[in-house]
């Protein structure tokens, strides 16, 4: 029997490129409702929206979602997740999945996969997903986070830089992906053991996390194991810009 898990969807109103992003309309529904709908299709026993904004809270209550108003001063999404897990009274060995509030096309199967992977790997406190990189432009794009793992699928590191750097191959040609190097893009969905979250918050950011702006590096810095599996379904891009929003509107608007 699969271990039960809770989905938490962080949703902040502030956004540099798209203010009020969670409330942007997509084919008659606010974006946060679209994300909530996808999460509800997963095997999660509970789906909770975590927001620091009264407008988002009211919208969620309007379409029947369970939602919590959190503190506004959290340093990261994981810090916000810890507050929610504590307020919900989740057991230390419970699993919580963090689904980003700007992923209205997230496949429910990936939510189930990342939760099941964590349950199957007791040596890890976090599980996440990745997919192959097929274009050299993605490898050199700092917005595409790369991940390298060991033989057991545990993360060695994450970086916005090309990882690993194929020295000899790139000395000859930087316009093609080197053969024999399994480059992978990190997909930003996480499952956590609740007991780990308090440690994560207590540690505070480390210099490596700050340099890359990747909070998962805080866990690796402290020796925490992160299991990384290849996603079973394609993860369609989320919404970061007005152009992304129009693309998703076309997909969901028919």
Curated annotation (Swiss-Prot):
Gene3D superfamilies reported for this sequence: Spore Coat Polysaccharide Biosynthesis Protein SpsA, Chain A (3.90.550.10)
A Pfam family per the record: CTP_transf_3
Reaction it catalyzes: 3-deoxy-alpha-D-manno-oct-2-ulosonate + CTP = CMP-3-deoxy-beta-D-manno-octulosonate + diphosphate
GO biological process, alphabetically ordered: CMP-keto-3-deoxy-D-manno-octulosonic acid biosynthetic process; lipopolysaccharide biosynthetic process
Enzyme Commission designation: 2.7.7.38
Record's keyword terms, sorted: Cytoplasm, Lipopolysaccharide biosynthesis, Nucleotidyltransferase, Transferase
Paired cysteines (S-S): none
InterPro entries referenced in this protein's UniProt entry, alphabetically: Cytidylyl_trans, KdsB, Nucleotide-diphossugar_trans
Name of the top EC class for this enzyme: transferase
Molecular function as annotated in GO: 3-deoxy-manno-octulosonate cytidylyltransferase activity
Tree of life domain: Bacteria
UniProt record similarity statement: Belongs to the KdsB family.
Descriptive protein name: 3-deoxy-manno-octulosonate cytidylyltransferase
Source species of the chain: Pseudomonas aeruginosa (strain ATCC 15692 / DSM 22644 / CIP 104116 / JCM 14847 / LMG 12228 / 1C / PRS 101 / PAO1)
Gene name of the encoded protein: kdsB
């Amino acid at each position: 029997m699969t271990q039960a898990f809770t989905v938490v969807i962080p949703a902040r109103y502030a956004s540099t490129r798209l203010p009020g992003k969670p409330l942007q309309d997509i084919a008659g529904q606010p974006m946060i409702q679209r994300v909530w709908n996808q999460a509800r299709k997963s095997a999660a026993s509970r789906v909770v929206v975590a927001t620091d904004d009264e407008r988002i809270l009211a919208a969620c209550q309007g379409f029947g979602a369970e939602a919590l108003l959190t503190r506004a001063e959290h340093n990261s999404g994981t810090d916000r997740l810890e507050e929610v897990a504590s307020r919900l009274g989740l057991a230390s060995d419970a699993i919580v999945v963090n689904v980003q509030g700007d992923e209205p096309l997230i496949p429910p199967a990936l939510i189930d996969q990342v939760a099941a992977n964590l349950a199957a790997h007791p040596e890890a406190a976090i599980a996440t997903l990745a997919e192959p990189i097929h274009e050299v432009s993605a490898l050199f794009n700092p917005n595409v986070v790369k991940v390298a793992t060991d033989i057991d699928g545990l993360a060695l590191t994450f970086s916005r830089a090309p990882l690993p750097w194929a020295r000899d191959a790139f000395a000859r040609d930087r316009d093609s992906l080197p053969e024999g190097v399994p480059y992978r893009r990190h997909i930003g969905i996480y499952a956590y053991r609740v007991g780990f979250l308090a440690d994560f918050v207590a540690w505070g950011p480390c210099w490596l996390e700050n340099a890359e702006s990747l909070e998962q590096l805080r866990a690796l810095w402290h020796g925490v194991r992160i299991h990384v599996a290849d996603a079973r379904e394609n993860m369609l891009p989320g919404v970061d810009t007005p152009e992304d929003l129009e693309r998703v509107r076309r997909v969901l608007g028919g």
